[in-house]
């Protein structure tokens, strides 16, 4: 922003106030409230106008230069806010804290008092219009204290607060799991990894991360003397949580959200999945971007926004708690066996609004009447579900049902107080039901009858003046006034009418008047209207207090409804898609019978194509095994690899799985090295990216890991690639001793199946027919002897000359492989590998005959009979 001090005598009082507020909020675009608009000035205006694609104007001068200005209307501000936030800006909102009349009491030149009431950032959003209903909006904080490090995260729109120990090497996988919108870090930290975070990064002062101050802030926030009842937190964990609370206090200007007591996630409590694996498996987001095509989109049958958020959380963080997995699967099994009960529950859940976020907005004093109506509707449906469920239910369902009751008094209060369809904003009034407050009803009657009297008064004035076009109108400047066209002005301004009608204003085409009785009526109407609005605001505050007094119970009910939604969604998915309950135990087994890929199967169904199910058994005599999979491109190796990883993930997320039978020993980690892409921004080739990811797997995978690797070593020379792939497989077998699927085109590696006890060969079957290859997509025991790359290239549409030349080269190379090394070298020396087969020569243009040439020269109309006869003899002679 351009410089300027408030003492500059060229600065108006309003601009001086703006400059002062702006100086207190550096790094944020300032939305400065002026009437019905938020205005922006100086550099803020230029930035906002470009980002929002709105007009940039000017307002006065500052230090001899024009002041850039732009603005957005209050009623549409949230849409503009969302655009700015998504483009990486932070926005400080300065509201008018008094009306102009109050300011004038302090003096004619007094400026309306304004204060920043909120700093809007990506991680601190609460409005429905700014949030994705089915996704969490996490704010994270990373803290390091000596040899300890921790990551804390909160979603202020739902009240969730969690923390975990997080050494720096684990930070990127944790951020990939949580997908936060904003990350808080200490400002002096070396942040070479910033570009990989994928969210807004906000540096804070080291004071914000002080662990001693953090402990005091947290105790005060939760009203306890010690945090020990919530867990034994390390200094780093306290530091991270304290930074979160400090930042929320800053951005919300003292109105802290309704956070639940912190949950400490233990290291190893969930399946470890790194960022590359999440991307390759497309768990919550497809490689093309967006949800469509991801595992999340394929399995999402939830009918509430909180249920959808819980589903994403479970898929992102599958548990390793065997007891919890069995409890969740038992609840899903119960509802698959009770289809009528399941449908009744889902029908009720469809009518449940997002109580979590409504409650958060109420706590932040950012709510409207519709948020109260959401609490009313959600609790009413909770009572209905609790009443319909049978007494005998699995433990998980029973615990959820217990939290749904006990809200009858609040529901009755909200039923009596609120109209059926409340308006969005409390300031508009009209949300308190008739009959709830007799005083309010009487005030409304006076207000509404006063408006009826206006109509009667207008009819009387028309009769007195004889002017049929006379109207009584209202605006915010004049209040109520009488308006006639300029053609009747002389009559109104002349006696006797001028004695009763007092001239107020003349505009183009109209003249405006008032009378004593109209002014008195206006006062009565305005008083009644203002009093009615004041009474409604009073009731709104009382209802807000009544709801927040029960916030803990309401929050538990909301979380229980989300749990029931997810259980019933998993049950519905299993019933419709014919999924089976997996057997999960503490063994090292991994036996999948007739497994399917949930996303690919769904896509094929749209085209009417059946999915070919396949078996997978990575248990050899009770010990982990590695399947070495060979076969052609396009046969389905990558799909087979991914589907088995997704089956393990779904099972530990508490879902049934797409298979006829599944026996899975608890999985601690899932690693995937599938697909290829370079990283130009960091100077990494495709092969380098592959090696980095493979190194991470070999260095981290434990004996409970599930690893899927596809074509390791393909990005370098053949023998280099084969050597790397060979050594990688041996390391997985000998050192990591984990369950693994290893797909390759290096057929030489199939010999390992006879040398390493835990390695077995498998291949994807194909059928050759009249020179074509037919993909059967069946995985069988055994090894492939070729990859059919030339046939796949022909299917891809390579030119026929290229395909023919490739066949020639392939035949020559394969023939050379069967001969001695010297003969093979001679063959390669003689073989022009990089010469394409010559195209067939173009047909030569036919030579013109003498007869044709002579005929072209003839002009028939110019020939006499004698000349024509002679010409025939000449042509005949040419033929001979």
From Swiss-Prot:
Residues 850-860 have a biased composition (Basic and acidic residues). The keyword Transcription regulation does not apply. It comes from the Bacteria. SUPFAM superfamilies: DNA repair protein MutS, domain I, DNA repair protein MutS, domain II, DNA repair protein MutS, domain III, P-loop containing nucleoside triphosphate hydrolases. One of its GO terms (cellular component) is cytosol. GO terms for biological process: mismatch repair. Residues 835-860 are annotated as: Disordered. GO terms for molecular function: ATP binding; ATP-dependent DNA damage sensor activity; damaged DNA binding; mismatched DNA binding. The keyword DNA damage applies. ATP binds at residues 631-638. InterPro entries: DNA_mismatch_repair_MutS (IPR005748), DNA_mismatch_repair_MutS-lik_N (IPR007695), DNA_mismatch_repair_MutS/MSH (IPR017261), DNA_mismatch_repair_MutS_C (IPR000432), DNA_mismatch_repair_MutS_clamp (IPR007861), DNA_mismatch_repair_MutS_core (IPR007696), DNA_mismatch_repair_MutS_N (IPR016151), DNA_mismatch_repair_MutS_sf (IPR036187). Keywords: ATP-binding, DNA damage, DNA repair, DNA-binding, Nucleotide-binding. Pfam families: MutS_I, MutS_II, MutS_III, MutS_IV, MutS_V. CDD domains: ABC_MutS1. PANTHER family: DNA MISMATCH REPAIR PROTEIN MSH1, MITOCHONDRIAL, DNA MISMATCH REPAIR PROTEIN MUTS FAMILY MEMBER. This protein is involved in the repair of mismatches in DNA. It is possible that it carries out the mismatch recognition step. This protein has a weak ATPase activity. Belongs to the DNA mismatch repair MutS family. This is DNA mismatch repair protein MutS. The gene is mutS.
